[in-house]
């Protein structure tokens, strides 16, 4: 692994920040590309010395020439593509969503083709699936049909299809990972970010209402980052999309964990009982057969780590109360 150099897009996002953190801690060189300038997620989980070891480049995945030049210039060997606009943003601006999420992904594969890089790990989504009633009861199997019901989900299906073409025509192996309900420090955007925001609110002594009820596959952000890194190092060959699984967890379980850790906040976290139109369980056995057992932080441990990190950022002044207010907005 000493000759590795990771190129990570979307590293100012939650999962990207955790990918960067893991790579820095193991001493692996990493170049990150992001169109945004905010580093508040990285500042939440990395100290200044650790951040200094990340090679930041401001850029747009929709610009193929720029992407290729950056990948070539840094000597990239391992690619983790996370840059994307999330579901609410794609709904608000489908044209921009397609440019970033589809064209941007094609550009990553094109750059890999031109530079003879033969492996990509990229973010897909459980949004590729249809509503719960479209599938039999139980965990959704690996080979279940895809019935996306949003622009965002359709873009992700397109990415998985294009990845398959790059495997068939150019021999580029790719693993598209479909996280479920990611939580943890830095998870402050997207449809399922409100459980993490509830943890931040508890740290600040503020009431908060989680925007959904029901049970879903909760996944701690650090675990998801580690799986992306492992996927980028696999010796498996082919192209496919894989669900990560996750621990089936209810919204009330999350609230109970928060209240257990911060008893004074009991009764201040509520939730909308309307469930999201997603299944709680996905069969990840095919992914496990390729990558081995996946990290799976227990809920209480993950919630505690999240609360501890946010409390520490307040105590050491790394993030101000104003910064955390922005997280809740």
Positions of PLM-derived features:
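C-terminal substrate-binding subdomain of Rossmann-fold SDR/epimerase-dehydratase oxidoreductases
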Residues: 206, 211-214, 218-329
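Conserved internal alpha-helix in NAD(P)-dependent oxidoreductase domains
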Residues: 77, 84, 95, 99-106, ...
């Amino acid at each position: 692994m000493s000759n590795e150099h990771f190129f990570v897009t979307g590293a100012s996002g939650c999962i990207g920040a955790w990918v960067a953190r893991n790579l820095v801690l193991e001493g692996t060189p990493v170049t990150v590309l992001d169109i945004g300038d905010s580093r508040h997620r990285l500042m939440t989980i990395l100290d200044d010395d650790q951040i200094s070891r990340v090679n930041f480049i401001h850029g747009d995945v929709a610009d193929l020439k720029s992407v290729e030049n950056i990948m070539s210039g840094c000597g990239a060997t391992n690619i983790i593509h996370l840059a994307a606009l999330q579901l609410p943003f794609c709904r608000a601006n489908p044209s921009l969503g397609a440019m970033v999420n589809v064209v941007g992904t094609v550009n990553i594969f094109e750059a890999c083709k031109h530079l003879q890089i033969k492996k990509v790990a990229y973010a897909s989504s459980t949004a590729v699936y249809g509503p719960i009633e479209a599938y039999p009861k139980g965990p959704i199997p690996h080979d279940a049909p895809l019935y996306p019901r949003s622009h965002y989900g359709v873009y992700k299906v397109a990415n998985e299809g294009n990845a398959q073409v790059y495997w068939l025509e150019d021999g580029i192996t790719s693993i598209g990972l479909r996280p479920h309900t990611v939580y943890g420090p830095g998870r402050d955007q997207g449809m399922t970010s409100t459980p993490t925001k509830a943890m931040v609110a508890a740290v600040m002594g503020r009431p908060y209402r989680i925007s959904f009820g029901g049970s879903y596959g909760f996944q701690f952000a650090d675990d998801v980052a580690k799986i992306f890194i492992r996927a980028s190092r696999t010796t498996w060959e082919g192209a496919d999309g894989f669900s990560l699984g996750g621990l089936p967890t209810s919204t009330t379980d999350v609230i109970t964990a928060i209240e257990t850790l911060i008893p004074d906040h009991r009764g201040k976290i509520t939730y909308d009982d309307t469930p999201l139109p997603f299944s709680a369980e996905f069969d990840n056995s095919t992914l496990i057969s390729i990558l081995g057992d996946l990290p799976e932080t227990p809920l209480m441990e993950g919630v505690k780590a999240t609360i501890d990190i946010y409390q520490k950022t307040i105590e050491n002044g790394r993030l101000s109360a104003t910064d955390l207010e922005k997280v809740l907005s």
